[in-house]
């Protein structure tokens, strides 16, 4: 099921998310809905707060054709190591459509999480995968990619998003 994605500014996007105690049937269904929503958008990552759920859950799939899809469901993800080398990617966000900016992050990160069967997982991500997982974990901590930008750029994007939300509310766009 495709779920509506919250748009910035929305106070729910700025909250610290609660840990998941167990991968219940409802939460696994939520994760699968999030994957459907992410692919439909289209995007490469989505965090539970972006669909209005204050839980530490993200989904992602950064594959590029012709490699096969690799959907990941991560409950309670945490970065346990990051490289000292950094890289810069132009990031966007499904909650801030049509806005992009360069963000510098560690080039590689090791992340621990529980999967949908509640098995412990750990993997080192590099490149776009590393950027994506860090971006999505930021959502769980109430942080958006625009929070890495200067105040003026962040305010400009926020004003544009407020205007876009008003237009959507009036039935436009």
Regions found by a protein language model. Give the residues of each.
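Positively charged
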Residues: 1-173
């Amino acid at each position: 099921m495709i779920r509506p994605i919250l748009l910035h500014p929305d106070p729910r996007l700025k909250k610290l998310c609660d840990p998941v105690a167990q991968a219940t049937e409802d939460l696994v269904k939520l994760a699968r809905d999030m994957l459907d929503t992410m692919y439909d958008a289209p995007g490469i990552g989505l965090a539970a707060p972006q669909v209005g759920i204050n839980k530490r859950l993200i989904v992602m799939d950064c594959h590029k054709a012709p490699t096969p899809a690799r959907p990941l469901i991560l409950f309670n993800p945490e970065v346990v190591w990051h490289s000292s080398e950094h890289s810069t990617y132009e990031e966007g966000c499904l909650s801030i459509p049509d806005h992009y900016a360069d963000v510098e992050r560690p080039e590689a990160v090791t992340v621990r999480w529980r999967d949908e069967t509640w098995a412990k997982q750990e993997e080192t991500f590099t490149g776009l995968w590393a950027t994506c997982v860090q971006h999505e974990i930021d959502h769980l901590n109430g942080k958006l990619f625009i929070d890495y930008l200067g105040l003026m750029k962040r305010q400009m994007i926020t004003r544009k998003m407020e205007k876009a939300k008003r237009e959507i509310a009036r039935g436009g766009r």
